[in-house]
Amino acid sequence: MTSQRTRERLIQRLCEEGVSNTKVLDVIRRTPRHLFVDEALAHRAYEDTALPIGHNQTISQPFMVAHMSELLLEAGPLDKVLEIGTGSGYQTAILAQLVERVFSVERIKVLQDRAKERLVELNLRNVVFRWGDGCEGWPALAPYNGIIVTAVAPEVPQALLDQLAPGGRMVIPVGPAGEAQQLMLIVREEHGFSRRVLGAVRFVPLLNGPLA
């Protein structure tokens, strides 16, 4: 079930759903998603669906990974991206092959440790990890010209807005956990921020504080 044919079916599905960035599609095609899920779920790794990874977290649906990556890159290449919510490390691995440097924050230590191991296995070495509160971002290394948030916040954290470079782009789900949520694209412009609502989504909540 992890054959090239299985992966190609996923790519075909993503194209049918509107993903058109060939770089994003190529990276998803060659990234072994089955390495980012438990062995018992490996046979479902190339389905276009979110899957549980423990600790009440999920590996995001491939379409959402592709869509958010595509939105982030819509205005051109990025050299410095902040990811909030490492999770399984799958989105991290996709970003690491699309941008120059990724800075990834995860509050659940055991998930972060597993993600690190997977990225080393894939020889992806342009990622720096931080165990901590994603709501705070990573101010010491700011600003970032891209920020991607993989959990839903009731409102856009001001700390993340502050860490977005001029012209930078943030993709973030916003809304109450378990209720109607919207994916938003935020761009830092000369005199403030522009916001574009991109459609309904469902994500796990963005929580405060690190967790061992």
UniProtKB/Swiss-Prot annotation:
Keywords: Cytoplasm, Methyltransferase, S-adenosyl-L-methionine, Transferase. Its EC number is 2.1.1.77. The keyword RNA-binding does not apply. GO terms for biological process: methylation; protein modification process; protein repair. It catalyses: [protein]-L-isoaspartate + S-adenosyl-L-methionine = [protein]-L-isoaspartate alpha-methyl ester + S-adenosyl-L-homocysteine. It comes from the Bacteria. It is found in: Cytoplasm. It is an enzyme of class 2 (transferase). Pfam families: PCMT. GO terms for molecular function: protein-L-isoaspartate (D-aspartate) O-methyltransferase activity. InterPro entries: PCMT, SAM-dependent_MTases_sf. Belongs to the methyltransferase superfamily. L-isoaspartyl/D-aspartyl protein methyltransferase family. Catalyzes the methyl esterification of L-isoaspartyl residues in peptides and proteins that result from spontaneous decomposition of normal L-aspartyl and L-asparaginyl residues. It plays a role in the repair and/or degradation of damaged proteins. NCBIfam families: pimt, PRK00312.1. This is Protein-L-isoaspartate O-methyltransferase. It comes from Pseudomonas putida (strain ATCC 47054 / DSM 6125 / CFBP 8728 / NCIMB 11950 / KT2440). The gene is pcm.
